[in-house]
Amino acid sequence: MSKSASRARLADIIRNRSFGRGEITLASGRKSDFYFNLKPTMLDPEGAALLAELTYEALRDEQVDFIGGLEMGAVPLAGAIAQLSWLKNHPIAAFFVRKKPKEHGAKLAIEGLAKGESLAGKRCVIVEDVTTTGGSAIKAVEAVRESGAEIVLVLTMVDREEGATEAFAEAGLPFRSLYKASEFLNR
């Protein structure tokens, strides 16, 4: 399937499985009359494959060691991309950032690293399923930077176009999205 056909098919899957209208309170605290819940798309076999494919293609020219983001939205996405990257002979390892470190066990804030493995000096991409203001992704960026990593890109599947671009620019973070909310609202 061509890139444009993959993108169109994924948009259809998102529209049918993950987009809705109706009043909702977003993670940012804002109210909205539409929403995206990408988990049904990320956990669908075809949706996961297409998200991984298009995300991997968006990262192809970046030199990336790790990909991850804040739990829960980044977990299935980072895992799918890591798997595809292995199959493409260009492995990108995955991790996720806990919203709050576990209070037991190793008490980790960043999960997915092997014993003794570190993000220090590594080039990382932060992924997010849906971005509104950028606040959740910036929390992940802060945790990953604290571990010594370099953030090369913040990549979201759907940008709601409600301030994230400006927030990332202000924070000096490159930002890209696979889709804009307006692509779904104007159809």
Swiss-Prot record:
Enzyme Commission designation: 2.4.2.10
CDD domains on file: PRTases_typeI
Any Pfam family matching the protein: Pribosyltran
Metabolic or biological pathway, per its Swiss-Prot or TrEMBL entry: Pyrimidine metabolism; UMP biosynthesis via de novo pathway; UMP from orotate: step 1/2
GO BP term (any one): pyrimidine nucleobase biosynthetic process
Binding site for 5-phospho-alpha-D-ribose 1-diphosphate: R98, K99, K102, H104, E128, D129, V130, T131, T132, T133, G134, G135, S136
Catalytic activity annotation: orotidine 5'-phosphate + diphosphate = orotate + 5-phospho-alpha-D-ribose 1-diphosphate
NCBIfam families linked: pyrE
Function per UniProt: Catalyzes the transfer of a ribosyl phosphate group from 5-phosphoribose 1-diphosphate to orotate, leading to the formation of orotidine monophosphate (OMP).
Record protein name field: Orotate phosphoribosyltransferase
Organism from which the protein derives: Rhodopseudomonas palustris (strain BisB5)
